[in-house]
Amino acid sequence: AFNEIAAKAKEDLGITMEMTALDSDSVVQKVATQPKAFDIADIEYWMCKKVWPIGNLQAMDTSKIANYDKIVGIFKNGKLTPTSTIAQGTAPHTVSFVEGANGKSFSSEETGWMTMIPTIYNADTLGIRPDLINRPINTWAELLNPEFKGKASILDISSIGIMDMAMVCEAMGEIQYGDKGNMTKEEIDKTIGIFTEAKKAGQF
């Protein structure tokens, strides 16, 4: 899709876009330390708290975003529907808005200045092969089910992987977190301990 975006930018704006593929940590490092090395940064929501306060990024005027009204509530107020529960962790809406074009502090509500536009809904966290399993998978606890020993894996982006691990531990009834996005040291140690033992047992 990125090649198509570059081609459309060339057609509509007359500019040639050069894409650079980087891993998540390298993106954070580049945005923080090399602001003149890029014009547009494709960052993820969890990165915002790390890089936005540095002041190397500029917010977008929502009045110039043609389809702003079509951006779902998850990114504006944290809710997909009026009765939705707001997510733990870095819920997108908590880092979606700042006070002005050059604002460094996040706003708790829409301000007309947006940090990021959602372009991709990732489905990379949990991959299931129903054609091989032949039964429903409806709980995160299945990730540590011995049935899948040697066939399971977790995401190697630590800020996301730790949240997946927490959902597994909670689903197993091993830990009840106060806030998975702001764990205590005890919660972190217990979570890592459970997965370390699973790794030693050959689950991953």
Language model regions located:
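Early extracytoplasmic/lumenal segment of secretory-pathway proteins
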Residues: 1-54
